[in-house]
């Protein structure tokens, strides 16, 4: 399933900067960055449960915000992209 994760982490103190890096690194491990604080994550149920739990452990609900958009498995026709920064097909072959 495709889940879009967006976040806004307060960086008013050094702990916020650390949380921001940790949230971004966690999202990079499961998806691709499509905007500064927005990731598209193609995950199965077990991966999603683990990712969501980790993100909820990292953020501070008093100062930060996390949003999850569940697009499901039939997401091809639900996402439109225009402009720069073309995205990679997460289901396609990976060339290294």
Give the positions of each predicted feature.
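C-terminal structural segments of small proteins and small subunits
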Residues: 58-96
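Extended, hydrophobic alpha-helical segments
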Residues: 1-34, 38, 42, 46-47
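Short, intrinsically disordered low-complexity segments
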Residues: 35-65, 70-72
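A short acidic (Asp/Glu
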Residues: 15, 51, 79
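Intrinsically disordered, low-complexity segments enriched in polar/charged residues with Gly/Pro
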Residues: 26-27, 55, 80-81
């Amino acid at each position: 399933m495709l889940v879009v994760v967006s976040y806004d982490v307060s960086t008013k103190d050094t702990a916020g900067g650390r949380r921001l890096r940790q949230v971004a690194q966690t999202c990079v491990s499961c998806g691709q960055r499509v905007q500064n604080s927005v990731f598209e994550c193609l995950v199965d149920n077990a991966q999603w449960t683990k990712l969501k739990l980790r993100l909820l452990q990292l953020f501070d609900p008093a100062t930060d915000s996390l949003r999850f958009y569940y697009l499901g498995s039939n997401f091809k026709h639900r996402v439109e992209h225009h402009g720069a920064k073309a995205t990679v097909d997460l289901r396609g072959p990976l060339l290294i």
